Amino acid sequence: MDRAALLALPSLCALWAAVLSLLPCGTQGNWMWLGIASFGVPEKLGCADLPLNSRQKELCKRKPYLLPSIREGARLGIQECRSQFRHERWNCMVATTTSTQLATAPLFGYELSSGTKETAFIYAIMAAGLVHSVTRSCSAGNMTECSCDTTLQNGGSPSEGWHWGGCSDDVQYGMWFSRKFLDLPIRNTTGKESRVLLAMNLHNNEAGRQAVAKLMSVDCRCHGVSGSCAVKTCWKTMSSFEKIGHFLKDKYENSIQISDKTKRKMRRREKDQRQTPILKDDLLYVHKSPNYCVENKKLGIPGTQGRECNRTSGGADGCNLLCCGRGYNTHVVRHVERCECKFIWCCYVRCRRCESMTDVHTCK
């Protein structure tokens, strides 16, 4: 880092501290800003100046070494949300930190508090990201209060030629920390709708955590002469976060609408379906999603005008669906690149200049 950058760092931290002091502390979602690359390094700001509610700040002060894992968990959740919805009408768009006005808003804007299917997915994927990141840190030996899962040691099935060993991911600690950091007590809220939405968010947080636990897999290593695999050492490991994202996207597609008049426990909105139990890993929502086809400045919805689409696809990225029946524009993009490169002795590379034309389709 050059001298000018070093001199500018204190000013940058002070600016972020001032901006973040404007963030509402009582919300669950502002911690998600930590996953944005342009946010900077939260460890340099300190717990007091981070966009956390009072409970989260207290936990941060007691366990400051967890900040890198919290930041990585937020980054994982944001990245996977954008990946899963990159071809959808709602593409998991996040606010930017280019202005104070945007930085003071929830990262996902309207969707974070709307009580829709999109809200459900955001809470689930972010909670899952936190579990995944913290558990990875435990397994890597980066923390003193957790490590590998020791409950499986010395177990297995000798008669079948395998035993538990290695380092199983301690997902239970990751889930415990995620609950401690994210889940607000319902008793602290006022208003019937607020209580229903908070209960919904808490359920979806847990659904995200359950997804990580449910998709745990078993890896094994063979031992024996010449790779005979006479004995296997096995351990439990978390699935890739991409696989967890696919699982939660499927849950999003099959999410359950609940009644906004829930009293003691959440119920399905449709009375004829109430005999079917709600499972821990189901995603729940209260309100139907808004129209993402057209711009709605009040809700911060950009619409799909100008989005690139696939003319030949019948899926969500196809021009017919993504453009909501409005049609699309086609323009030709010229690409110039180096090609057919050859090494000439001695000592340079000679390339041809190749041009290609590509049709690009964008929604009207």
Curated annotation (Swiss-Prot):
What SMART domains does the database record attribute to this sequence?
Answer: WNT1
Under InterPro entries, the record lists: Wnt, Wnt16, Wnt_C, Wnt_CS
**Disulphide-bridged cysteine pairs:** 81-92, 138-146, 148-167, 220-234, 222-229, 293-324, 309-319, 323-363, 339-354, 341-351, 346-347
Range of residues in the leader sequence: 1-29
Localization per record: Secreted, Extracellular space, Extracellular matrix
GO cellular component terms given for this protein = cytoplasm; extracellular space
* Glycan-linked positions: 142, 188, 310
For this chain, the Swiss-Prot or TrEMBL PTM comment says:
Palmitoleoylation is required for efficient binding to frizzled receptors. Depalmitoleoylation leads to Wnt signaling pathway inhibition.
- Location, primary (coarse class): secreted
**For this chain's UniProt record, which GO biological process terms are given?**
bone remodeling; cardiac epithelial to mesenchymal transition; keratinocyte differentiation; keratinocyte proliferation; negative regulation of apoptotic signaling pathway; oxidative stress-induced premature senescence; positive regulation of gene expression; positive regulation of JNK cascade
Offer an example of a GO molecular function term for this protein: signaling receptor binding
Reading the lineage from the top rank, the first entry is: Eukaryota
Say if the entry is tagged with keyword Hydrolase: no
> Mind listing the UniProt keywords for this protein, alphabetically?
Developmental protein, Disulfide bond, Extracellular matrix, Glycoprotein, Lipoprotein, Secreted, Signal, Wnt signaling pathway
* O-palmitoleoyl serine lipid attachment residues: 226
Q: Does the keyword Lipoprotein apply?
A: yes
Q: Which family, according to the similarity comment?
A: Belongs to the Wnt family.
Annotated function: Ligand for members of the frizzled family of seven transmembrane receptors. Probable developmental protein. May be a signaling molecule which affects the development of discrete regions of tissues. Is likely to signal over only few cell diameters.
UniProt cross-references to PANTHER family, sorted A to Z: PROTEIN WNT-16, WNT RELATED
Question: What name does this protein carry?
Answer: Protein Wnt-16
Organism, by scientific name, is Mus musculus (Mouse)
Gene that encodes the chain: Wnt16
